[in-house]
């Protein structure tokens, strides 16, 4: 992967689900709601001064959210951060930089 360029969209992995799970409470607090389902479906990653993960998450029924999660460099020892998110997404909506 080239530094700065997002990767191609890939199916979510166990690691992707783990990342999404770690920021779930941040999203639920910002949206003031609990999601009955929180299943990572696909993702892109972008290497910057750390890594941005763009994750499509199924949150119930036909509803999806897109998350941008920042993981700092390992030596910084910082928690994952929900940098941004988009609600009202559908299964067919493409993951793009936001």
Swiss-Prot record:
Name of the protein described by the UniProt record: Cystatin-B
Localization per record: Cytoplasm; Nucleus
GO biological process: adult locomotory behavior; negative regulation of proteolysis
Site (Reactive site): residue numbering on this chain: 4
Keyword Acetylation: yes
Alphabetic keyword roster: Acetylation, Cytoplasm, Disease variant, Epilepsy, Neurodegeneration, Nucleus, Protease inhibitor, Thiol protease inhibitor
A molecular-function term among this protein's GO annotations: endopeptidase inhibitor activity
Organism taxonomic ancestry: Eukaryota, Metazoa, Chordata, Craniata, Vertebrata
């Amino acid at each position: 992967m080239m530094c700065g360029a997002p990767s191609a969209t890939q199916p979510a992995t166990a690691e992707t689900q783990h990342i999404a799970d770690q920021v779930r409470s941040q999203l639920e607090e910002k949206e003031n709601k609990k999601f009955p389902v929180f299943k990572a479906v696909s993702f892109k990653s972008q290497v910057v001064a750390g890594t941005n993960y763009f994750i499509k998450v199924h949150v119930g029924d036909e509803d999806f959210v897109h998350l941008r999660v920042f993981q700092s460099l390992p030596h910084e020892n910082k928690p994952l951060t929900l940098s941004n998110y988009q609600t009202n997404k559908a299964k067919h909506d493409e993951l793009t930089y936001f």
